[in-house]
């Protein structure tokens, strides 16, 4: 072979290798021959120039999870119960898209779990014991988790927990006979119709599997009740069937909104967290939905194959979404209860609050508090306010003090306010009462150096300093006002360079940020909404103004707390409060002492937040701790809750005079006030302002 031919051959092989490397694929896991047939149809009809679809067949969902985890497959669409199971070890899968059952303009990513019975039967919900039951599958949402959880909650089903017997054994004693595909207890497989090894398998190889299968079990007179979704019963059969309501009434199939077991999250597409394939899967499915020949949501070989037939589209989930946030705290905790048993109320024994800290300095202060509190306070670690919110949602922490902007997010994620900070040292009367209607407030202000030419009316192109994206005084108020006045959602293009911790580190909103000057190697922490960014928070925004910016957005006390010798840090020790002024919304300026007349807004105080069922416990303990370590506490010489060493505003704002208990049942919106709540809601319509956690918590409302 001559040299030129060898070179040509090598180049051809190299080109082939590069082509193979560039070819992207999505390997879909299917669980039956009927799903495999549909998948092969999709391979032929859902062509994509850059991404190839292929099919991987396994016997059941668990095998698919293993295949995805071991990189033999990439994706599967499952119900909420399996979203939860797939997120656990050893699978570590995450949801990336949700089925939409509404329309392309009005999405609905939830469905209803219902109990379907024949009209000819006469029993009520409370008379389910000793009836024959048809279920979609073990661990599935509508067919198992919701109904079994409800039976336990209503104390119709007796189960002392896994230490006494398995949940399956307890359920097998409750129903006369059942078909629960995937169950191990023989009596729960008694009604199933699969042949040989396929009997009671958790796949379409079992005729009574899934929604259509559970309904067929009822149709075939094998069962007395089928636990399915609201759209399972075909319209032509509505005249013969009705819904069993938890209040012991019955209603027509069409009245599912008033007669259901629960409204639950949609089915979701799962993939690996490791070597993330999300982008390819989402891109393929989005393109597939645009192709008329590609029938993702029809099942010519059965029912609900690969996706539910009632789905109209697939919607990408926010990047911050995990299985817990997708399912919601109530449903996630309900599934956990099915594993551990319903615990007796132990609120009397709960004598501690786990406080979430957001920096090393906060953790140090919290550890000191723990030591002297006699175990009433424990500490958890996080690096941002949003991480603390998630910890509380997941039950890993109990409380944290938040700024109004983060409180807005926390409220939409399901947390409630417990204790509000109070700042007015000229009127301490509310602090001396056991109950008070007073509310703490502070002022959002725009701070500038005296002698500069900046005014509120000429902020275009100005270098700005913010406490963090999503915080009240440093972002929501000033950016909301500017956005409202200019009609421009693109705040980054309006101002010059900024430091707005929490922004995209590559954007000009992070251009002024410096990270932690003492840890230069941690460049990844630059612009982090945490103490890892030197320009984070009130004092951080003021430092940014001093060193780099032209205007700083903070609270009315920020200048006083960092000047005239109040802050010994090198950047602040020589600063004089008289060298700074406030920008007024009317275009004028005022001394920093005139904050009540020259401010951007009066805003709600920071507050302690927790889960609704922890509210009384947290309030009781914090009130007690304040009586000991507050400004007038009996043991304030040992520890002071509202004083910070090694930092500013640690755990609570240093300007806090006391914490006022917020009346029980007060919602987050009521505490923040309609005006502020509406302002933040409007600001969040600008996509650049909406945090990942907020997007996840508001994705759907089941």
Curated annotation (Swiss-Prot):
Hydrogencarbonate 1 binds at residues 136, 140, 142-143. One of its GO terms (cellular component) is extracellular space. Residues 26-340, 353-685 form the Transferrin-like domain. It is found in: Secreted. Its main location: secreted. Gene3D superfamilies: Periplasmic binding protein-like II. Disulfide bonds join 29-64, 39-55, 134-217, 179-192, 245-259, 356-388, 366-379, 413-697, 431-658, 465-544, 489-686, 499-513, 510-527, 584-598. Monomer. The keyword Chloroplast does not apply. It holds the Pfam family Transferrin. Transferrins are iron binding transport proteins which can bind two Fe(3+) ions in association with the binding of an anion, usually bicarbonate. It is responsible for the transport of iron from sites of absorption and heme degradation to those of storage and utilization. Serum transferrin may also have a further role in stimulating cell proliferation. This is Serotransferrin-A. Residues 340-349 are annotated as: Connecting region. GO terms for molecular function: metal ion binding. Keywords: Disulfide bond, Ion transport, Iron, Iron transport, Metal-binding, Repeat, Secreted, Signal, Transport. It comes from the Eukaryota. Fe(3+) 2 binds at residues 403, 442, 538, 606. Hydrogencarbonate 2 binds at residues 467, 471, 473-474. Fe(3+) 1 binds at residues 79, 111, 211, 267. The gene is tf-a. Residues 1-19 form the signal peptide. PROSITE patterns: TRANSFERRIN_LIKE_1 (PS00205), TRANSFERRIN_LIKE_2 (PS00206), TRANSFERRIN_LIKE_3 (PS00207), TRANSFERRIN_LIKE_4 (PS51408). GO terms for biological process: antibacterial humoral response; iron ion transport.
